[in-house]
Structures are given as C-alpha cells and as structure tokens.
Amino acid sequence: MALRSLSKIDQLLLGVDKALRAVVPHSNPSTRPLPVSSDEIPELSITESRHVAGLMRINHTGEVCAQGLYHGQAFTAKDNSVKRAMQQSAEEEVDHLVWCETRLSELGSHPSVFTPLWYGMSFGLGAVAGAISNEFSLGFVAETEAQVSEHLQDHIGQLPPQDQRSKEILAQMDSEELHHRELALANGGAALSPLMRHTMRWMANRMKATAYHF
C-alpha cells in the first residue's frame, strides 16, 4: 500500500506493529531461507559455542538497531522516495534479523535482554537524522552500514574454523549491508564529519560490549 494512502492512525499502527516485530523474537517470517550450503549443524565446544553465541547476539542487536534506525528515518523523512528507500532496506534486513535469531536458537542462546532499549534509541537517532535533511539521513545510513560491515568481517575472522554455517550467514549479511550503503550514497547521502563518525563508532562499541554478554 502506498504511503500517501495511509492515514496518520494507520501509519502509527503500522509503526507499532513493525516495532513489536523488531523486538519480539521469532515474530517475523523470513522471506528467504538461511544462506547456508548445508543443513548440518557444526559441532562446537562449550567455549566456542558461547563465543559464537555472543557474536551472533551482537549481530542480532545490530539488526534490531538497523530496524529502529530505518523506521525512525522513514517516520520523519521529508521525501517520499527516501521513505520508500528506508522501508525497502528495513524489509530486506528483516531476513538478517531472522537468520541471527535462528542461529542463536541453534546455539541454545537468546537475543540481548536489552533489545527494546536498543530499538528505542536507534529509532530516536533515525528520527532526528530524518528530520535534519534527506542528505544527512542517507549519509547516516551509509556510515552505519559501513561500520556494520566492519564488525561483520571481524566476526567472520573470529569464528571457529568448523563453523561454516555462521560464516556463510554473516558473509551474506555483509554483502547486503554494503549494497544498502551504496544505495544510500546513490540516493544523495552526504559524508558525515569525522566527529560524527567517531561518536557513532564509540556508541557501537558500547553496544557490542554489552550485547556480547547480555
């Protein structure tokens, strides 16, 4: 349904539904299967399993933050084409959310207990970015996706050699994050200041340190 055909109440209800789906585990259907070459679950030691679960919890939290960011930006973006771009990217990343949840379940673990907090903070940041300007909003997305790609590549390097399953999931996510970055830049995203990029990285590091354990 086109954005312009929705009433304010409809848009609010749709936003609440999207928020709940982002923070409630296993509430989203995946439109694509896990991007893995085998259904075999790799054997991991207890220590390895805990470490991989910590990494996947970080990645799941990152996807929750991405949902909040995109939803917030779509809520305040001034241009309907930008709103549509934000919503399309958010919908594509729902699969990432589901893939991380699935792998966490396979590892006998769970998402971060602070998931609602991460979503709320990200929604607020996205809404502010969207209200400033389309160029800033899209630049914020581009920088976010670049930093997400960095930590995905770092996590791939930390995985146990036998955990090809997690590696393939993260590799597919990384490829799509970079595509979303290029899409944001192609739609007019502006480069952020060094201070802004540093602040975003600092906040992301705090999130990762917390989500790994909780």
Swiss-Prot record:
Fe cation 1 binds at residues 63, 93, 96, 177. The keyword Oxidoreductase applies. CDD domains: DMQH (cd01042). Its EC number is 1.14.99.60. Binds 2 iron ions per subunit. Gene3D superfamilies: 1.20.1260.10. Keywords: Cell membrane, Iron, Membrane, Metal-binding, Monooxygenase, Oxidoreductase, Ubiquinone biosynthesis. It is found in: Cell membrane. It is an enzyme of class 1 (oxidoreductase). It is a peripheral membrane protein. It catalyses: a 5-methoxy-2-methyl-3-(all-trans-polyprenyl)benzene-1,4-diol + AH2 + O2 = a 3-demethylubiquinol + A + H2O. Pfam families: COQ7 (PF03232). SUPFAM superfamilies: Ferritin-like. GO terms for molecular function: 3-demethoxyubiquinol 3-hydroxylase activity; metal ion binding. GO terms for cellular component: plasma membrane. One of its GO terms (biological process) is ubiquinone biosynthetic process. Pathway: Cofactor biosynthesis; ubiquinone biosynthesis. Its cofactor is Fe cation. Catalyzes the hydroxylation of 2-nonaprenyl-3-methyl-6-methoxy-1,4-benzoquinol during ubiquinone biosynthesis. Belongs to the COQ7 family. NCBIfam families: DMQ_monoox_COQ7 (NF033656). This is 3-demethoxyubiquinol 3-hydroxylase.
